Amino acid sequence: MNVVPRKSLGQHFLVDENILGVIERLAELGPDDVVLEIGPGLGVLTRFLAARVAHVHAVELDRRLEAELAGIERTTLHWGDALRLDLASLAPSPSKLVANLPYNVATPIVAESLARTDLLQWCVMVQREVADRFFATPRTKAYGSVSVLVQLATRRTGFHPVSRDVFRPRPNVDSALVAFTRIGPGADPGVKRVVEAAFSHRRKTLANALALAGAASRERAVAALQEIGRGASVRAEELAPDEFVTLAEALA
């Protein structure tokens, strides 16, 4: 490996091919699939995907990896920030996101990808605590805005702990593969705005958090909570994902 991973980019390159079979199973790869991969690194997963699917769109920020990623069959390389990529411009259009996501952008990448309704399945390698957040239940420490957004759009279909030894450099945290599939369009912009505001001040009551974030006055928030059967003292982590939809409707 000639490229030194950069901590600033959250790079932990996948180097052990033994995990690839698990990815293939959890991602339910098929010959007609078009896959989006973000953070291909040294191309270990990219080559594996390209040999099994119709097309791979690989998005990489680090130009030092050009030599590692050049010439992979059935693969289009996109250089730049994945969070600024216009997924609608990709042709053919990907229906699956399969990736060893960079640690420092894994959560926003997944959250933003939910808005693309043509993406139907995800299989991502992330920090274990991030994977736990995606499908955390209300009233738990891990439950937050990304939990609500992910669960409004998807259901979990697979989970697999990943050894630290499959990466270089070896990370100081545990990782996991988590797979999920779309069940609906997910949160619209109004719901997303309420969810993010609700969790922006976790130590406050939900009504106060919404007021502090500028999403609604406290009085209006309390009235909306009462409309959905919740009291003024409820906190964001007590509401189930679908309750945020009804709350947003009450606030509209």
Q: At which residue positions do the language-model features occur?
A:
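Amphipathic alpha-helical segments within well-ordered protein domains
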Residues: E196, A207-A211
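Conserved Class I S-adenosyl-L-methionine
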Residues: N172, F199-K204, A215-A252
